[in-house]
A protein has these predicted regions:
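Pyridoxal 5′-phosphate
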Residues: 2-438
Length: 438
């Protein structure tokens, strides 16, 4: 028996949080006031897989989460009983698909507490959502000599579009530094503001380190200077309660595939007043009211930003995913994931020769680490041989790697369906790596 298998057998996989509300899963029985991870895991068929004869331990949730059976079932139901193109069709299937698509929009509105459903735009993912803001807002309102504030922690998707805009317009990017724990230096952030500051882009949670940024505080400061803020919420929306009204953010972007939903779908929330002033990102069907060769009149929001046939099935699947997560409760999810992170952090800190990269006091369930003398890709390869899936590389956050003077890290990222036994399996796997390279 391998160290991984021993860890999985020696520790109960059931984690109970006595303060959690009841959870109803596809097993049909509510958890009755406790969070039972085994009942949750029963909803995820893929978690029963074996890798090389060993149980799959999926700890790559920051890259993409797994999909529960209710979401799979909803996608099948759409494809087998409701599939049609939306809008303008007067037949049963088209009207049904249109209704379900717009209901998914309303579900996302409620999930993030947007004021109106027209403030929710379906995109292909976080990357397209950010690019939509860059093209629709940035190209219209940011010009030569203007400044855009980003942070060292940003994913490349919230750096490259703004670099493209800065090069096109003659604007300048200013960067908020971080400390050795991977926390933003808020005092330095505030010093960057001046009369030329026109936009702020900041991630809610660092995908590379797990740092939870004080975005509400940052938004308030920016607004005091008349500057709008886009929040990259790709790593926050799946793991904690997001309230865009409370944050008062101007834009908020996230992806479906990190949220137990399908790939190819994402969300851009934008304040209606800003969206109405923005230019469309793409031209095509459904984003227009009228077209002649002389002039096109654009549709109202959100439709003017959804050109062509949208990802209908994916949107409906994402609606089912947020139903599933809401049924568990985002606060419950956050509490369970924090318990996993704390246990993993405690165990890794006891391991000589293993260093955690990113030790912020306020973190989401991301654990980036480096094993002395072992390249992260070798760590990932050996863990995979034990059935443990982690992500290795720069995590599309090369400025973060440069700040910590590492080429890459190994990253374990937890979800609510992970168990304490799986954390122990990760630790056992790291020990195996150290033995191989001893």
């Amino acid at each position: 028996m391998t160290a991984i298998q021993t860890a999985l057998r020696s520790r109960s996989a059931s984690v109970l949080l006595s303060s959690a509300p009841g959870v109803t899963t596809t097993t049909g029985t509510p958890a009755m006031g406790s969070f039972d991870v085994e009942r949750i895991r029963a909803d995820f068929p893929i978690l029963g897989l074996k890798v090389g004869g060993k149980p799959l331990v999926y700890l790559d949730n920051a890259a993409s989460s797994q999909m529960p059976q209710p979401v799979i079932d909803r996608l099948v139901r759409y494809q087998t009983t409701q599939h049609a193109n939306i809008n303008r069709g007067v037949h049963y299937l088209s009207e049904t698909a249109t209704s379900e698509y717009e209901e998914a929009r309303r579900k996302l509105q409620r999930f993030i507490n947007a004021r109106e459903d027209r403030e929710v735009i379906f995109t292909s993912g976080t990357t397209e959502a950010i690019n939509l803001v860059m093209h629709g807002y940035g190209r219209k309102f940011i010009g030569a000599g203007d400044e855009i504030i980003l942070t060292t922690l940003e994913h490349h998707s919230n750096i490259v579009p703004w670099q493209m805009l800065a090069e096109e317009k003659g604007a300048k990017i200013r960067v908020v530094p971080i400390n050795d724990a991977g926390e933003l230096l808020i005092g330095e952030y505030e010093k960057l503001f001046n009369e030329r500051t026109k936009f702020v882009g900041v991630m809610h949670v660092s995908n590379a380190l797990g740092t939870i940024n004080p975005v509400k505080q940052m938004i308030a400061f920016a607004h005091a200077h008349g500057v709008p803020v886009l929040v990259d919420g790709a790593q926050a929306a799946p793991h904690m309660k997001v309230d865009v009204a409370d944050l008062d953010c101007d834009f908020y972007a996230f992806s479906g595939h990190k949220l137990c939903g399908p790939t190819g779908i994402g969300i851009l929330y934008g304040k209606a007043a800003l969206l109405e002033r923005m230019q469309p990102f793409k031209g095509g069907g459904d984003m227009i009211l009228s077209v002649t060769f002389e002039k096109t009149t654009y549709n109202t929001i959100p439709h003017k930003f959804e050109a062509g046939t949208p990802p209908i099935a994916a949107a409906i699947g994402l609606g089912a995913a947020v139903d599933y997560l809401s049924g568990i409760g985002m606060d419950v999810i956050a509490a369970h994931e924090l318990a996993l992170l704390n246990h993993a952090t405690e165990q890794v800190n006891r391991m000589p020769g293993v260093r955690i990269i990113g030790t912020a006091g306020n973190k989401a369930a991301v654990l980036s680490f480096a094993v002395d003398g072992v390249h992260p890709h070798d760590v990932g390869t050996l863990l995979n041989q034990e059935g443990v899936a982690v992500r290795t590389g720069h995590h599309c956050a090369q400025p973060v790697m440069q700040r910590f003077r590492v080429p890459a890290t190994s990253r374990a990222s937890f979800a609510f369906y992970n168990s304490m036994a799986e954390v122990d399996a990760l630790i056992a796997g790291i020990r195996t790596v150290q033995k191989v390279f001893a």
